[in-house]
Structure formats: C-alpha cells, structure tokens
Amino acid sequence: MRLLIAEDELDLAEALTVFFERNHFTVDAVHNGADAYDYGVSGEYDAIILDMMMPKMNGIQVLERLRAEGVKTPIMMLTAKGQKEDRITGFDAGADDYLPKPFDPDELITRVRAMLRRSQSYQPSLLACGDLTLDPASGLLQCGDTSLRLGGREFQIMELFMRSPRQVFSAEHIMERIWGWDNEAEINVVWVNISNLRKKLKSIGSRVTLRANRGLGYELEDAT
C-alpha cells in the first residue's frame, strides 16, 4: 500500500515514515503544501496524510485543489488545532478523517486502515504471479504450503514487481520509488535487496524469479 505523508515537522515526518514502513506501507514524505499537491495529484497513492499547517500551501488548500482535480484518494488531516470549526472546514473541503496532535501512532494507522477499507480504491486481495502470492496487508510471501514474511524494503520492492509483473524496472527507478531521491543510500542497496529476494523465492520453492534484463533492469518472471 502506497502512502503520501505531507508534514512540515521533519522529525515527525521521519518518525511516521519509519512507523508506516515497518507496517508494510510504501511511503513518500514531503514537507510543504506545494510538493504535497504535486505528488498527490498523480493519483498513485492509496492514502494521503496531510498536515493542516504547512509552508507554501496549507493542508486545506492542498485538499481543495486535489478534490477539484478529481483526486479521490482517501485523505487524513493532521493538525495541532482541535477546534470544531477546523474539523468542519476540513470535512467540507473533502477530508475523509481528521486527527488532532498529539496522537498515538497506533490510532493513526488504525484510522488509515479503516479509511482504506471504506475507499472504493482499496484492494485487499492477494497479489499473484505464477505459483507465488503476496499479501499486501501482512507481507506474507507464499508458494504452495511454504511461506515467509517480508519486511521493510524487500516487501516494498516485491510489492512493486507483483503489481506490475510484466514490467521492467531499472535499478534507478526502484531507487526513486522505494528510497526516494533525497535518500543518501547508494544504488548497490537495490542490487543487495534483489539478490536477497531471489534467495527467498528459491527458498520457498517458487518458479518465479527476478530476472535481470541486461542494460534495462529487472522483471518478475514465471519460469514455467
């Protein structure tokens, strides 16, 4: 599940990113309203978390513009303001839920999951390719009666491939999608994670593998 977090408090944004990634979300984090709009209008996200007070454009303005563009992605508003008027303004602008700061991360993720269940765009079904299935909710990778649980970047990479099994992804594209351009990680972390995933696919006896296309990238292949 792909999540956009728009929060101008850098420490909070980083903490939320780590928390959601540990719970099998793929997260992009931005720190101002202009970037929140630019990312959100792409329609690539299953859910968006918007802080009310951000530079360049506040959360309500971002929300109104996204809804005006026809973006139906479920949106959760976060704010230090707890007044009823602010909640009403957010809901009137098209917010799906609202949580005042400070909050418990467990309550936040519970609300996000509930928001996803209510959304028509939410797809809780298993992802499948050949003899392989991946449960996006739990990270369980299974072949026949054998399974293992993926976490962190390995889960995010496998989910990317399982959602587009015939698509070739370059290492650079994987780096951008999973780590983000602002991350200081080196490109070889992609190769390491691909290698680890190949070993895990083999360990559960799957015919499916991550095949390298020389000069192009990697694709998920069912070697039947």
Regions found by a protein language model. Give the residues of each.
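Positively charged, aromatic-enriched patches within helix-turn-helix-type DNA-binding elements
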Residues: 140, 145-208, 214
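Short boundary/linker motifs that mark transitions into or out of structured domains
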Residues: 130-140, 216, 224
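A short linear beta-strand->loop->alpha-helix hinge motif most characteristic
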Residues: 208-224
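N-terminal/domain-start alpha-helical segments
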Residues: 1-119
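Short amphipathic alpha-helical/adjacent loop interface patches that line ligand
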Residues: 24, 109-112, 136, 178, ...
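The C-terminal output helix
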Residues: 114-127, 166
